[in-house]
Amino acid sequence: MMKKLTSLLLSAALMISLLACGAFAAKTERGVRIAGLKGPTTMGLVNLLDMERSGKASQHYDLQLYGAADEIVPKLIKGELDMAAIPANLAATLYQKTNGGIQVMAVNTLGVLYIVERGDTIHTAEDLRGRTLYVSGKGATPEYAINYILTEAGLDPEKDVDLQFCAEHAECLTNLLANENAVAMLPQPFVTVAQTKASDLRVALDLTEEWDKLQEGGEAPSSMITGVVVARK
């Protein structure tokens, strides 16, 4: 089951091609400098890098991976990077800070966030009341997504749930594996990795499904966009 899920995740990543971005991003002597976060926001770059290795790409791409978005933002603003896969909410901030110098090229990540636990106690957002939840992505899309879902469930994110923010998804995973009562919000492929390390771990909530339920019947329903690709003009 784990091999099948991992295969599906990689296949989905390969479906997303960003070849058109090369015409937009600035060229440098060492190629187009791309930054990505460790996790789902970078999975969409797999096809691009595969094409470069096979000699099918139009130019060289230099990919650098980072653990947090705040490591990428200043490099983009300073011109040390040409493109980046970042949390969706940061795109608007970068656009404003650079007076339109950095723009969105594509949406490359939808959803992929899950509430996981070691046990069988959480079945609705209400079940998170009084629990400690390990989350990565403070000030980014993951925080806004969980706050929205908790609020719509009648919970106060600051009072009813103990949100413990971690620097990286890997830190959330470490806390989850170290404590049998821990609950964490993780993206793929970290969920799959966690399931290979803890046999009692289960996906309690699919936040994409929870988000979509809240959009039903709305005047302007939206999708949970978690990652985009941005580039300098």
Regions found by a protein language model. Give the residues of each.
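Short beta-strand->loop
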Residues: I34-K38, R131-T141, A153, E158, ...
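Immediate post-signal peptide segment of exported/extracytoplasmic ligand-binding proteins
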Residues: A23-R33, R53-Q59, T98, D120-T132
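Ligand-binding cleft/hinge of the Venus flytrap
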Residues: V46-H60, E143-F165, T174, E180, ...
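A bilobed periplasmic-binding-protein/Venus flytrap-type ligand-binding module shared by bacterial periplasmic
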Residues: N47-L49, L113-H123, G217-K233
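Short, well-ordered beta-strand elements
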Residues: T28-P40, Q59-L65, Q103, G130-V135, ...
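Short, low-complexity disordered leader/linker segments with a strong preference
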Residues: M1-G31
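Pocket-lining segment of extracytoplasmic ligand-binding domains
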Residues: N89-L90, Q164, E171-K233
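Short, polar/charged alpha-helical segment
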Residues: L37-I77, L94-K97, Y144-E152
